Amino acid sequence: MTMKHDVKTFQGFILTLQEYWAQQGCAIVQPLDMEVGAGTFHPQTFLRSLGPEPMSSAYVQPSRRPTDGRYGENPNRLQHYYQFQVVLKPSPDNIQELYLGSLQALGIDTQVHDIRFVEDNWESPTLGAWGLGWEVWLNGMEVTQFTYFQQVGGIECSPVTGEITYGLERLAMYIQEVDSVYDLVWTDGPMGRVTYGDIFHQNEVEQSTYNFEHADVDFMFTLFDQCEKMCQHLLSLDKPLPLPAYEQVMKASHAFNLLDARHAISVTERQRYILRVRAMSKGVAESYYQAREALGFPLCK
């Protein structure tokens, strides 16, 4: 039974996207329970895009980018925000039509509004990943990123995975016609109206203060080294453990992002740290591929 959700609330907006993509055959999975900078880090995207096994999924992913914090003073810059990620493997021929259908489900008339696909190829140096892509502009504002993964963890993607990443806050601000993310209505029900600011404003103030002023630099350097060491250990076992090793990659990546926010890494060092994360990602990708291959790629029917 299809329920009609109020897309003029952030809650209803997310529920509508989930329901739409579920109807297209996606598994609606849950967010990763770790600090990541983007939905692409979720194993459902990074790891599942490797090898021949088909997989279509969709999920909300809380994302953290410490350097983007503004102490809750900027109406559209956040250090913690939400992405809605759709991963389609193999990428269907009608992926753009499916995306436009999701906008229609959100009440956006694609015949009336100016919707443009602007070429913007994507790259993630830390994940050793890149793809051909497009930004989707709605009346002159970027709201979504399309990517066709060509390579992940240094491994060629075959078949190609199609990824759609919605910027939830930005798209919701457009739908609700508000100028500040904190004015977004999260829900408006029997218990009263709750805004995005009611839930997250204090968090933005405090986390920005931590990210820029109090994150322990020495601890973060040590944490990065320890995560790298553990990742290498897990991959060197007689029976490697690529999934736990990948968690170490994500922890190291977040430690790096906090060091970046604290201005603790020089330009030269920054590149070296990116290459260290990339080397870990590549090792995980190769190990994961080999593990699935040893199982006979069980999702291939």
UniProtKB/Swiss-Prot annotation:
Pfam family, one: tRNA-synt_2e
EC number of the protein: 6.1.1.14
Domain of life: Bacteria
Compartmental location: Cytoplasm
Keywords annotated in UniProt: Aminoacyl-tRNA synthetase, ATP-binding, Cytoplasm, Ligase, Nucleotide-binding, Protein biosynthesis
Catalyzed reaction equations: tRNA(Gly) + glycine + ATP = glycyl-tRNA(Gly) + AMP + diphosphate
Designated name of the protein: Glycine--tRNA ligase alpha subunit
Upper taxonomic lineage: Bacteria, Pseudomonadati, Pseudomonadota, Gammaproteobacteria, Alteromonadales
